[in-house]
């Protein structure tokens, strides 16, 4: 198995575990997730911490876990494209609250950095795979 594919799959697994952990923490109302800010109601697509947590668990937890399993087990070339798509989705989900509410929060900035890294890993891996295929075709000619 390609070393880059292992690293990208490991990063996706780490993000999946983080999404499951944060989603569970939010659902259990642990930490800072007590009352949903009233100024967010009507401006954000979610109106409670629970709906936000379930969205994060399903989309980012299950999505990244599925991509990680694909990368570790199936050894497929689609891992990089799916990783880039999940990175773009995390990037968009991180920027959206700043646009809708008009303020940046520390977790949003951290998620933005994580999303940019995931997007970059996916794009780099995909470009590398494309370059390998181009070189193989050139050798055959």
Q: Across the structure, where does each feature detected by a protein language model lie?
A:
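Topology signature of small-to-medium multi-pass alpha-helical membrane proteins
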Residues: 2-141
């Amino acid at each position: 198995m390609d070393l880059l594919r292992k690293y990208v799959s490991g990063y996706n697994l780490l993000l999946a575990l983080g999404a499951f952990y944060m989603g569970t923490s939010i659902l259990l109302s642990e930490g800072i997730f007590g009352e949903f800010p009233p100024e967010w109601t009507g401006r954000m697509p979610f109106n409670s911490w629970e709906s936000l947590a379930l969205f994060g668990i399903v989309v980012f937890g299950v999505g990244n876990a599925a991509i990680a399993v694909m990368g570790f087990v199936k050894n497929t070339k689609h891992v990089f494209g799916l990783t880039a798509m999940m990175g773009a989705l995390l990037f968009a989900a991180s920027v959206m609250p700043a646009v809708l509410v008009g303020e940046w929060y520390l977790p949003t900035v951290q998620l933005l950095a994580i999303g940019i890294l995931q997007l970059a890993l996916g794009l780099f891996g995909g470009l590398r795979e494309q370059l390998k295929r181009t070189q193989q075709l050139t050798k055959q000619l």
